[in-house]
Amino acid sequence: MKLRVILGKENVEKYQGINDIDIDIIYDDDDLIVQSDLSQSFYEIGPNKKIYFFGRVVGIKTNNIELTRVSGKSDFNEIFTAIDIEGIDNVVNNIEGRFIFVYIDNNKVSIGTDALGQIDLYYEKYNDGAILSSELDLLPFKDNSKIEYDQTGVAHALYVYGYRPAKKHTLYSKVKRVGLHELAE
């Protein structure tokens, strides 16, 4: 799955109309572009409220115990109602599956992963905003002639985890990973 979210007016102007990675533009406005090669579940919750799920949503936990399966828009109504009442940051941890979501509420954008962080979501602060991606090669740091390494990330990859950096780190100093129960806004 390839997903890239571009935030910030200057970044959007730079990338607008450029399909440098051969993936579809899902959403496009003055200060936000969402691109993906994966079919997504898109739902318009209300006026100026939209949510995209990239990946697979299995169900939602009710009362933190029972799992209610979801498969279509009518099944997602419980999720939408909960988001309207409690907010996306309180509801997303009760949604089961392997996914990345993009929630647009008027001029505010929230991006995150499922409660277990099963799909990595990387971000790089860039110009006046940020660029988030499911893959490192979709971020602009690679275009820089001098790549700087994150020493903590390198140490964890070599000594602690054996193959990868700690959850919020990457091997690169300018690129971070969205942590568990964390939203990029």
Q: PLM ranges: what are they?
A:
Residues 1-185:
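Cysteine-centered catalytic environments shared across enzyme families
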